[in-house]
């Protein structure tokens, strides 16, 4: 496997690893309110930072309905 392929694989797996680590730090609650975003695999940790994902705006974000 060359360096380019390894780099692409690393980029694809980083969000999944990040989500797993966040769950482990938060006590491993897989289905708690903090972990409702399925391990940050899609939004790359928006909830952890307190921001809103790009597809959620305004009052929906403040009401946590995303």
Swiss-Prot record:
Naturally occurring in which organism (per UniProt): Californiconus californicus (California cone)
- Taxonomically, which superkingdom? Eukaryota
User: What is its subcellular localisation?
Assistant: Secreted
Q: Which UniProt keywords apply?
A: Antimicrobial, Cleavage on pair of basic residues, Disulfide bond, Ion channel impairing toxin, Neurotoxin, Secreted, Signal, Toxin
| Domain notes from UniProt | The cysteine framework is XIV (C-C-C-C).
**Family statement:** Belongs to the conotoxin L superfamily.
- UniProt GO cellular component terms: extracellular region
Name it. Answer: Conotoxin Cl14.1a
Q: How is it modified after translation?
A: Contains 2 disulfide bonds.
- A GO MF label: toxin activity
Q: Which residues form the propeptide?
A: 20-49
Q: What does this protein do?
A: Probable neurotoxin with unknown target. Possibly targets ion channels. This peptide could be considered as an apoptosis activator in some cancers (tested on lung and breast cancer cell lines). Provokes the decrease of H1299 lung cancer cells viability after 24 hours treatment, and induces a high Bax/Bcl-2 ratio, which suggests that this peptide can activate apoptosis in H1299 cells.
Signal sequence, start to end: 1-19
Tissue localization of expression is:
Expressed by the venom duct.
Where does this protein chiefly localize?
Answer: secreted
């Amino acid at each position: 496997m060359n360096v380019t392929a390894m780099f692409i694989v690393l980029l694809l797996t980083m969000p999944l690893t990040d989500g797993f680590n966040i769950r482990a730090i938060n006590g491993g609650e897989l289905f708690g309110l903090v972990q409702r975003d399925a391990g940050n695999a899609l939004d790359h940790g928006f909830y952890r930072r307190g921001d809103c994902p790009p597809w959620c705006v305004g009052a929906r974000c403040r009401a946590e309905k995303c």
